[in-house]
Amino acid sequence: NNSHGFVPPPYPYDRLDVFKTAAAKHVGGIIDLSVGDPCDAPSSAVIAALSTSHLERGYPPSIGIEPLRSAAHTWIQRKFDIDVPLAQIAACVGSKEFVVTTPQWMKLRTPSRDTVLFPAVSYPSYAMGATLSGCRPVAVPMTATGGLDLTKISADDAKRALMIWMNSPSNPTGALDDMGAVVAWGRKHDVPVFSDECYVEFTWQGKPRTALEYGTQGVVALHSLSKRSNLAGLRVGFYAGDADIVHYLKEVRKHVGMMVPGPAQAAGVVALNDDASVKTQASVYRKRLERTAQILSKWSGRAIDL
């Protein structure tokens, strides 16, 4: 900020453009790991749903069509063996807009608090969402294993905290957080926990986990089809959890006009019901990671842990 108002900083990925020209000169061309666009094809059934939904004429419901919310509901049951009431699930326009805009809506809900806590090593949109909402972005230091070091949150920051973000598996580290500990900390300090779980299908150690395993009170989980289904271009996601928070966000987002296009929602239904393609994609990613780990280990002389 300055005396003339907010001046946006350089967009993180735009800052890499200067390096792309040099990288492109290498034999084999550039390997772009910046934004993380999926490079594999989505399911043909998903593509077919886009052109046959007949939902392009009308305005789509902001909370998501019932089949999409039901598909999210049954996916949560299949994946995590827990039941979240349908009323506590709603659509979002991919995950990024939810990450960036939610602090603004939460600030309207609880104007007495002004701080957004987020992982120190993380997706840059957590901090920017706090800034754009007029809140204080406060990075929480990481533990040696890559989770949130809750002991490093000051009493003042905890008292002022509007919300805390958790990201597990982490982007960019892949680390798994202690979800139970974060949820317990949030409840102790009356701070809603927002759990970004967009990479849960690509959990390499143990079974996929969600913060909702510890109950929905004070917890909202965020999911996206961008990576799991190679649909980053459709912008389809959903959030689920605490009844009061989800209801509030649903109502505010209706007024804002946050709507996933109807055909994209129809495609999302097909994608959420398709576990086979996701399993295949996870296998592809794991093989690529294992090969990358071999190359990096040989180059660096250090063991690389997936």
Predicted regions and their residues:
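Hydrophobic/aromatic ligand-binding patch that stacks against planar heteroaromatic rings
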Residues: M128-A130, W185, A211
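PLP-dependent aminotransferase class I/II
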Residues: G218-A221, L225-D305
